[in-house]
């Protein structure tokens, strides 16, 4: 269960939607999308100013380097080649962050926050990981993993956008 609201470096954000990521028949993680106000489309989410958060709680053990690779692939699948190539240094650093953790166990969390004026802050198990990613496009590219035209999980995309389960 995701909290109804969160604090992103002093900015209050509310739960827009939450759901589980399935791989085959297994729930892999639960994710929540937090925004300054409700949004029902990917375009609204990407265009919305202010702090934003994706919060993920693992529901089973996962290999962190595999998670990093899936993030990279999810970003690449949801943007054109030239946009992706500009973000490669950030993508490499993101993969590095996850591979340093070896694995994430059930119940462990990570957050990806957009902090206006600071950038994207990745927090794993409650600890901020290195310097913020400065480019706004990087956070939006991460969001597209879940909300883009080729989402990680269609049902999760609908849930994060606050749509009732079918």
Task: Give each language-model segment a name.
Residues 39-117:
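Mid-length scaffold segments of soluble, non-membrane domains
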Residues 155-166:
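Cysteine/selenocysteine-centered motifs that mediate thiol-based redox chemistry or coordinate metal-sulfur cofactors
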Residues 1-48:
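N-terminal secretory signal peptides
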Residues 6, 121-123:
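Short aromatic-centered micro-motifs
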Residues 129-156:
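Flexible glycine-rich active-site/ligand-binding loops centered on an Asp-His dyad
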Residues 124-128:
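Short strand-turn-strand beta-turns centered on an Asx-Gly dipeptide
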Residues 73-80, 144-148, 161-162:
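Short, intrinsically disordered, mixed-charge
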């Amino acid at each position: 269960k995701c909290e109804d609201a969160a604090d992103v470096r002093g900015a209050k954000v509310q739960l827009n939607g939450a759901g589980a990521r399935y791989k085959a028949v297994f729930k892999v993680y639960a994710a929540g999308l937090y925004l300054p106000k409700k949004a029902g489309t990917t375009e609204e989410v990407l265009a919305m100013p202010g702090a934003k958060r994706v919060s993920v709680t693992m529901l089973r053990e996962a290999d962190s380097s595999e998670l990093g690779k899936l993030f990279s692939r999810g970003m690449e699948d949801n943007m054109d080649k030239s946009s992706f190539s500009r973000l490669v240094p950030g993508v490499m650093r993101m993969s590095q962050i996850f591979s340093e953790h070896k694995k994430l166990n059930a119940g462990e969390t990570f957050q990806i926050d957009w902090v206006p004026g600071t950038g994207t802050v990745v927090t794993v198990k409650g600890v901020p990981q290195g310097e913020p990613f400065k480019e706004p496009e990087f956070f939006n590219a991460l969001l597209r993993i879940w909300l883009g035209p080729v989402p990680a999980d269609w049902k999760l995309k609908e849930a994060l956008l606050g749509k009732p389960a079918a």
